[in-house]
């Protein structure tokens, strides 16, 4: 998912990539493409490079003023992404809660209630 969707531990990752448990974001597989692209490769909705050329150069960095409050400009994807709270020392068995933008904050998710399945 993009920066506004659930993290990869909850939503999974596309084929060929893995979930980084520290950032809760998908890591991108290496692009193996025999095409030279003067402006670099296009990116998928996950922010991973794909074997298609960009038609114009990518901006050096996105503008922080373009990002909603509580988010930052990612140099990797040139998109607004969640800030990671490096001061949060909580160990949460069900993960951290997320705000309305899909960003984690330093509060544990409650225990999941088990609902019996009907046969």
Curated annotation (Swiss-Prot):
Positions of post-translational Pyrrolidone carboxylic acid modification: 1
Cell compartment(s), UniProt: Secreted
Gene Ontology molecular function, alphabetical: heparin binding; serine-type endopeptidase inhibitor activity
Site description Reactive bond, residues in chain: 34-35, 89-90
Top-level taxon of the source organism: Eukaryota
PROSITE patterns: ANTISTASIN
The entry's keywords: Disulfide bond, Heparin-binding, Protease inhibitor, Pyrrolidone carboxylic acid, Repeat, Secreted, Serine protease inhibitor
GO cellular component entries: extracellular region
InterPro entries associated with the record: Antistasin-like, Hirudin/antistatin, Prot_inh_I15_antistasin_leech
Protein name: Ghilanten
Biological classification of the source: Eukaryota, Metazoa, Spiralia, Lophotrochozoa, Annelida
